[in-house]
């Protein structure tokens, strides 16, 4: 049963990471409006109980650089194109949130005057305190860094209590549960266990960044009803990665 509006959240400020692929929903490419609307509803539930929400969205639903890089495209060019894809996703999510009457700001790591604001940490924290959702896009603004790394970086910068990584499975497994029937799910892991077992939940840079700054990460199934709000009020969902 979902928590009531009177429920006290365990986390006051969270950084939610959505993959670009998650926005595709049942489509093969692009953005499924039904997914946007559902995420807007779930984020609205968090705002409703007083949780401050920062958001990072990947760009894999619109651009995947690996195939082009394999064909000879420069890596930096491909990464810049990927950053632009995250801006497009951020604009789509902002639109969905604002249609749900949720005040939202989009901040880009690369200047895009007239389209979105440039990232400003102090301004972002002020906006979060005022109850606005803040969407951080364009990754870190640098090539060679994933949006998982960007999510962890922004989470640390805005003093979030936890990074919530939304995926298509309900946590971290010993193997890919889509391919290996007897894959074991972990309820809790340390950063070092993730690295030693090469579990691949996030890239090395992202996990090391969280480890060095003590930022807990919870991996959960974004398609499970009420999973997001359950986590925020302290219920067990998915896998928690933290210090040992």
From Swiss-Prot:
- List the keywords (alphabetical): ATP-binding, Cytoplasm, Kinase, Nucleotide-binding, Pyrimidine biosynthesis, Transferase
Q: What is its EC number?
A: 2.7.4.22
Answer whether the UniProt record assigns the keyword Flavoprotein to this protein. no
Q: Which CDD domains match?
A: AAK_UMPK-PyrH-Ec
Which Pfam family is an annotated match for this chain, by its short name? AA_kinase
Q: Which pathway is it part of?
A: Pyrimidine metabolism; CTP biosynthesis via de novo pathway; UDP from UMP (UMPK route): step 1/1
MF terms from GO for this chain are: ATP binding; UMP kinase activity
Q: Which residues bind UMP?
A: 59, 79, 140-147
Q: How is its activity regulated?
A: Inhibited by UTP.
Quote the record's binding site residues for ATP: 17-20, 60, 64, 167, 173, 176
Q: Which reaction does it catalyse?
A: UMP + ATP = UDP + ADP
Compartment(s): Cytoplasm
Q: Name one GO biological process term.
A: UDP biosynthetic process
A single Gene Ontology CC term: cytosol
Q: Per the annotation, which location comes first and is thus the protein's main one?
A: cytoplasm
| Subunit and interaction comment | Homohexamer.
What is the documented function of this protein? Catalyzes the reversible phosphorylation of UMP to UDP.
Q: Which family does it belong to?
A: Belongs to the UMP kinase family.
Q: Which NCBIfam families match?
A: pyrH_bact
Which protein is depicted?
A: Uridylate kinase
Instruction: Give the species this sequence originates from.
Output: Hahella chejuensis (strain KCTC 2396)
């Amino acid at each position: 049963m979902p928590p009531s509006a009177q429920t006290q959240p365990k986390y006051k400020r969270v950084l939610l990471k959505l993959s670009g692929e998650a926005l595709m929903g049942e489509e093969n490419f692009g953005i499924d409006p039904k997914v946007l609307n559902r995420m807007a509803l779930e984020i609205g539930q968090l705002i409703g109980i007083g949780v401050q929400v920062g958001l990072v969205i990947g760009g894999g639903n619109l651009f995947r650089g690996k195939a082009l890089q394999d064909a000879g495209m420069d890596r930096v060019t491909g990464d810049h194109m990927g950053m632009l894809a995250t801006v497009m996703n951020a604009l789509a999510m902002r639109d969905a949130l604002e249609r749900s009457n949720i005040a939202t700001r989009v901040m880009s790591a690369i200047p895009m005057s007239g389209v979105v604001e440039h990232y400003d940490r102090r301004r972002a924290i002020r906006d979060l305190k005022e109850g606005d959702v803040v969407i951080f896009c364009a990754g870190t603004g640098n090539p060679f860094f994933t949006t998982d790394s960007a999510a962890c970086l922004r989470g640390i910068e805005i003093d979030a209590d936890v990074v919530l990584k939304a995926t298509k499975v309900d946590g971290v497994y010993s193997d890919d549960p889509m391919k290996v029937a007897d894959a074991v799910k972990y309820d809790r892991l340390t950063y070092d266990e993730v690295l030693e077992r090469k579990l691949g939940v996030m890239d090395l840079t992202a996990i090391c960044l969280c480890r060095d700054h003590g930022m807990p990460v919870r991996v959960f199934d974004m398609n499970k009803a009420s999973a997001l709000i359950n986590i925020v009020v302290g219920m067990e969902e998915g896998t928690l990665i933290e210090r040992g």
